[in-house]
């Protein structure tokens, strides 16, 4: 595994560039869909583009879970990451419901679209098509 990691590190700039380009493609093609909130793409900042996570909000015709199922039924894997810490049994006693309203709201809206260095435009187009047709 260490050998794989070292090999990946040698190509990290190329990998990040591929992920960035795929993120920009999603961003360009998913703009202006009511109820779909895209991640901020700040020109003077850089990151690894590890995920492309959208928010599915009320103006959109489907809930996040409904969109998740529709994408899955079309052979597209999406993921919901980062369960709020107050949902874990070990931390539940520390959270007051009134203090975690936004956390719960965001958690119920987020959906990570497929994103990996070798993702094709064809694959992305199928994701975009399902979202736009919803």
Question: What do the PLM-derived regions correspond to, one by one?
Answer:
Residues 1-134:
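PLP-dependent aminotransferase class I/II
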